[in-house]
């Protein structure tokens, strides 16, 4: 960390990622330093009834409302109106586009979004509930394809402006991730009771381009 601080003082115009690369550190040293540079992550846990329309769940809706501003891109909008540019595979939804999410994200210009909302179906059951069997075959292929989700996250990293916000709803707190230059700001855990999985909401800020 001392070497990092010395380099930062000598080259104030360089980004954190550029400094870390210039120092030629091993991956483990990079990760350790990045963690020290990150702000503390705020974690909340609020119970709420489940709903297939994630952004209508009260604590999640309140969180999203705090962050949305400017150009808000939503590749899995369903009935949500938070996005200023919305996409949904189902043509019955009131969205601007009806494309596969990855194809939609690739249409967006680089560093054009202030916020990206990311709430895809993570299981075949979710896909059936959210899309009423529309595009079932394609959805099943995508849900089971981890490479597909990784490519979607790469596109999210590309289209967000520096300091842009990504809000992800899912079953893990992985988010977009450090390697894509994102720092975790907030995690919301929403338990639903019984045997239902918690909904985990991550809020990340784009601080750099890809780190490693």
Positions of PLM-derived features:
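Short strand-turn motif at the edge of the Rossmann-like AdoMet-binding core
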Residues: 120-121, 170-172
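SAM cofactor-binding core of SAM-dependent methyltransferases
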Residues: 70-107, 125
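A short acidic, Gly/Pro-enriched loop at the edge of an enzyme's catalytic core
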Residues: 106-117, 124
């Amino acid at each position: 960390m001392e070497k990092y601080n010395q380099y930062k003082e000598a080259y104030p115009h360089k980004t954190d990622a550029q400094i870390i690369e210039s120092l030629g550190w091993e991956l483990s040293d990079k990760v350790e330093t990045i963690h020290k540079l990150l702000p503390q992550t705020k974690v909340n846990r609020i119970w709420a009834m489940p709903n297939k329309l994630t952004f209508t769940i009260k604590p999640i809706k309140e969180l999203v409302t705090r962050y949305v501003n400017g150009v808000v891109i939503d590749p899995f909008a369903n009935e949500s109106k938070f996005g200023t540019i919305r996409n949904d595979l189902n043509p019955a939804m009131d969205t601007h586009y009806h494309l596969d999410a990855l194809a939609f994200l690739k249409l967006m210009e680089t560093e054009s979004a202030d916020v990206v909302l990311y709430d895809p179906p993570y299981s075949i059951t979710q896909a059936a509930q959210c899309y009423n069997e529309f595009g079932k075959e394609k959805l099943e292929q995508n849900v089971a394809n981890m490479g597909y989700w990784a490519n979607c996250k790469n596109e999210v990293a590309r289209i967000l402006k520096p300091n842009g916000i990504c809000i992800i709803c899912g079953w893990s707190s992985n988010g977009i991730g450090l390697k894509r230059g994102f720092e975790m700001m907030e995690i919301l855990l929403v338990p639903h009771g019984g045997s239902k999985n918690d909904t985990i909401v991550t809020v990340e800020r784009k601080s750099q381009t890809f780190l490693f």
